[in-house]
Each structure stands twice: as structure tokens, then as C-alpha cells.
A protein has these predicted regions:
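Surface-exposed intrinsically disordered loops and tails
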Residues: 78, 268-287
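Active-site-proximal beta-strand/loop segments in catalytic clefts of secreted hydrolases
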Residues: 191, 205, 237-238, 260-264, ...
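Intrinsically disordered, low-complexity Pro/Gly/Ser/Thr-rich segments with frequent PxxP/GP/PP motifs
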Residues: 241-277
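A structural motif detector for short, solvent-exposed N-terminal "entry" segments of globular domains
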Residues: 194-239, 289-294, 311-326
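Long, compositionally biased, intrinsically disordered regions
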Residues: 33-199
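Conserved beta-structured recognition patch
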Residues: 281-348
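N-terminal single-pass transmembrane signal-anchor helix
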Residues: 2, 8-39
Length: 348
């Protein structure tokens, strides 16, 4: 009996020691938690700005890949009564004027029609729809990681937006999808600021049209996102005479061609997706009315960043110089090299 009593006393002592240890450890955790709260320390990155980007990237990707999305058109204000989930059927101009939250899903799968329609959305329009702050920018990429068709492995379905290297800090959210024998990745990067990758290319210019046709300028958007023309301008110089046009409206879809023309009614559209009338604005001519010089001239496409006041040349086209003397019906065609050198242009 005495031996049993000794065992019982030892067990009670051990239990008491364990309880005292747990109580002390719990008290320690409470003190540590209170200290961290008072010191306003944050676990994880210890940087509120980075945490803010992390939340924005995570929420943005969730909104992008959790549903069909929505579009609210503009009609003297946002027309909520005619809002729709079929945002992918709206034009680039309509999407830019209204409010869109692109969603990529249909019946719980990635919808290729919606992915293709991202070319009609501007980066700023997507950022606003996903709820990003005004000082944030984004980059979105969608790729085929695995496929039953080896030729589709690594295929880029969309890759556009502000490059990470132009921003001081960034955060990335990633999601993969397995469907129809393929695996896709959707990667959303959210940046603190950054310089927009706004590049447009003048690919062909008609200075001396034949048969009383209109002057025209063909512009290509090599980006996957659409680009709004607000902030873009054109400058034409011939001798001591110069004319400028600040573009106030219009959107060019990603990976598409647009025509700026002196007369839309007589313009041959070809494979252009958009036609903008610059004849009514007096910049391009038609018939006997010249907007661009028939002799020697210089045309510049310019862009002004939102935080700058001076426009920067993006493309320059010069004619009436060696090898580039035009006759009626000939156009200047860019060969795809230097956007500022006359040697990159030929006659067609």
C-alpha cells in the first residue's frame, strides 16, 4: 500500500509540474502577443506596402478566375439596369467607356472566348474592375503548361501589362486549371506604380492617294491589352509649317490594326478592326485637300505619360528624302525594324 501511495504522489507531482509549465507558457504567449500589438509589429513581410500588394494580387486573381465577370455600359452615366455578364461581347470602345470586371470562367472552366476578349480591355480598365488602387498597375499572363498536343505546350494565350522591372515593388498571385486535356496557368502581377508599356506602331502611310481617295495612316497595337488613344498625339511637319492633333477618344484593341483616315466613307478598310475619322478634325485630307505634304514631310506619333507634360516620339516617318519620293497611289510601308529611321521604310 505504501508503494502505491508513493507512485500516486509522484504522478500527482508530475501532473502539477506539467500544469505549471503549460500555465507559464500560456502566460508567456499572452505577454508576447500583447507586446507585438503594442509595438504595432506585423508578422510576415513586416512591410504594410507589400502586404497591401499581396492582398490586391490575391483578390484580383480571385475576381478574375471565380466567375463570368460583368459589364456596366455607359449612357449619360453608368447604366446598371443593362449590366450583363456577357462583357466579352462588347466592343473595345464600349468597354472603355463603361465599367468592366473581366471574368474568365464559364461553367467552372476557363472560357477561351473571354480570354480572347481581353484584347478589348485596357490595362487601366481591368485594374479598375478588379478593384486595384489608382497607384497600382498590373501584368497578366495566361499560358498552356501541358497539352495532349505537343505544339501547344508553352503557348501564350495572353501576356500584357506593365513590366515588373518598372515598379519598385510587386506581388504575384498564381492559379492553374486542368481541363480538356490541357493545364493552364493564370498569373496576375500587381505593381506599386510602374511605367505603362504603351507602344503603338505606324505600319503604313498613304500621303498621295490616287483617284481622289483619302489620306490614311495605319496603326498597329502590338500589345495584348487594348490602348486608349487619350494622351496620344500626331504631329506633321513640312518645311516651316507644323500641325498637331491631340487625340481625345478612341480605343485600339490589342494585336489589331486601326486606320486613321481623311474620309471613312471612301476608305478601303481591309483587315483593320477600327476606323477613326481625322478628316473632320482637319489633320488628314481627301481628294484635292491635303493634310499631309505631297513633297517632303515628317509625321510623328507621340505619347505623354500621365505624370509628364512633354510628349515623347514613339514613331517617326519621313518622306521626300533619298529613296522615299512618292508618286500618286504609292504608300510608305514600315519594314518592322527601327521606328525612327527612314531606312526602315519602303515604297509600295
Amino acid at each position: 500500500m505504501r508503494r502505491a501511495s508513493l507512485h500516486s504522489e509522484r504522478d500527482e507531482g508530475a501532473l502539477t509540474a506539467v500544469i505549471e509549465f503549460l500555465s507559464a507558457f500560456t502566460l508567456f504567449l499572452m505577454i508576447l502577443t500583447a507586446f507585438l500589438s503594442l509595438a504595432q509589429l506585423q508578422m510576415g513581410s513586416n512591410d504594410p506596402a507589400v502586404d497591401r500588394l499581396d492582398r490586391a494580387a490575391s483578390l484580383g486573381l480571385d475576381r478574375l478566375t471565380s466567375g463570368e465577370g460583368w459589364f456596366v455600359p455607359m449612357d449619360e452615366g453608368l447604366d446598371y439596369t443593362n449590366s450583363t455578364a456577357d462583357w466579352h461581347l462588347a466592343s473595345a470602345d464600349a468597354l472603355h467607356e463603361g465599367r468592366v470586371q473581366p471574368g474568365l470562367m464559364l461553367h467552372h472552366k476557363l472560357d477561351m472566348h473571354r480570354i480572347s476578349a481581353l484584347h478589348n480591355v485596357t490595362e487601366d480598365g481591368m485594374a479598375a474592375g478588379l478593384g486595384l488602387d489608382d497607384d497600382m498597375s498590373l501584368h497578366l499572363s495566361i499560358r498552356v503548361l501541358e497539352s495532349d498536343d505537343p505544339q501547344r505546350v508553352g503557348l501564350s494565350l495572353f501576356d500584357g501589362g506593365t513590366e515588373r522591372g518598372t515598379a519598385p515593388s510587386s506581388s504575384t498571385a498564381y492559379r492553374s486549371f486542368q481541363q480538356d486535356g490541357e493545364r493552364y496557368s493564370v498569373v496576375l502581377e500587381v505593381h506599386d506604380g510602374g511605367r505603362k508599356n504603351n507602344i503603338l506602331e505606324i505600319t503604313e502611310v498613304m500621303v498621295r492617294p490616287s483617284s481622289s481617295g483619302p489620306e490614311w495612316i495605319e496603326i498597329h497595337n502590338p500589345n495584348d491589352f487594348a490602348i486608349a488613344l487619350r494622351g496620344w498625339s500626331l504631329n506633321h511637319t513640312s518645311g516651316s509649317v507644323s500641325s498637331n492633333l491631340l487625340l481625345q477618344s478612341g480605343v485600339i484593341s490589342g494585336q489589331s490594326l486601326s486606320l486613321l483616315t481623311g474620309d471613312p466613307s471612301s476608305q478601303v478598310v481591309g483587315n483593320a478592326s477600327h476606323v477613326l475619322d481625322l478628316g473632320a478634325l482637319g489633320f488628314l485630307g481627301v481628294g484635292q485637300i491635303d493634310g499631309l505634304s505631297d513633297g517632303r514631310g515628317l509625321l510623328s506619333l507621340r505619347y505623354t505619360q500621365l505624370d509628364e507634360i512633354t510628349p515623347a516620339d514613339v514613331v517617326r516617318v519621313e518622306w521626300g528624302v533619298e529613296g522615299l519620293f512618292l508618286v500618286a497611289g504609292q504608300s510608305l510601308v514600315w519594314e518592322g525594324n527601327d521606328r525612327f529611321s527612314s531606312s526602315s521604310w519602303s515604297l509600295e
